[in-house]
């Protein structure tokens, strides 16, 4: 199965995405990661106001297969979290790049986006294996 990813998104090697939306960054996990996890049963996210450091764990996602940490693709402050995903984890499964987003972050250094993989590079990486 070949995965397609939104062209404007940037991706971490650990499969989280960052999407610039005005001055804020929408964060989630890729459709590839969701597919690898299987049926998602629980999502744990930080509270609004929490500080994220790039590359450090910010929460976890639990599926029937495993519990996996999620890592911040960018540093900043959490300004919103997706309560719908917390209440119904299947939202993440159904639309990871849309309604299944996880956090909105006010970045401390927006230039960190440039350190992430562009959509084409990430797509080639996950579709090659």
From Swiss-Prot:
Cofactor note: Binds 1 lipoyl cofactor covalently.
Pfam families assigned: GCV_H (PF01597)
Any Gene Ontology CC annotation: glycine cleavage complex
The protein's required cofactors: (R)-lipoate
Domain of life: Bacteria
Cited CDD domains: GCS_H (cd06848)
GO biological process: glycine decarboxylation via glycine cleavage system
Post-translational modification N6-lipoyllysine, affected residues: 65
Domain Lipoyl-binding: 24-106
Keywords for this protein: Lipoyl
Similarity comment: Belongs to the GcvH family.
Quaternary organization: The glycine cleavage system is composed of four proteins: P, T, L and H.
Function summary: The glycine cleavage system catalyzes the degradation of glycine. The H protein shuttles the methylamine group of glycine from the P protein to the T protein.
Listed PANTHER family: GLYCINE CLEAVAGE SYSTEM H PROTEIN, GLYCINE CLEAVAGE SYSTEM H PROTEIN-RELATED
Protein name, as recorded: Glycine cleavage system H protein
Organism per entry: Synechococcus sp. (strain CC9902)
Name of the encoding gene: gcvH
């Amino acid at each position: 199965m070949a995965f397609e990813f939104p062209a404007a998104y940037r991706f971490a090697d650990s499969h989280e995405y960052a999407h610039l939306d005005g001055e804020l960054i929408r964060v989630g996990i890729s459709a590839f990661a969701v597919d690898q996890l299987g049926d998602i049963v629980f999502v744990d996210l930080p509270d609004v106001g929490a500080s994220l450091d790039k590359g450090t764990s910010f929460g976890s996602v639990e599926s029937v297969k495993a519990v996996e940490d999620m890592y911040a693709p960018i540093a900043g402050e959490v300004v919103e979290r997706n309560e719908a995903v917390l209440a119904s984890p299947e939202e993440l499964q159904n639309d990871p790049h849309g309604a299944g987003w996880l956090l909105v972050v006010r970045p401390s250094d927006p230039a960190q986006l440039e350190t992430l993989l562009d959509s084409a590079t990430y797509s080639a990486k996950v579709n090659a294996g």
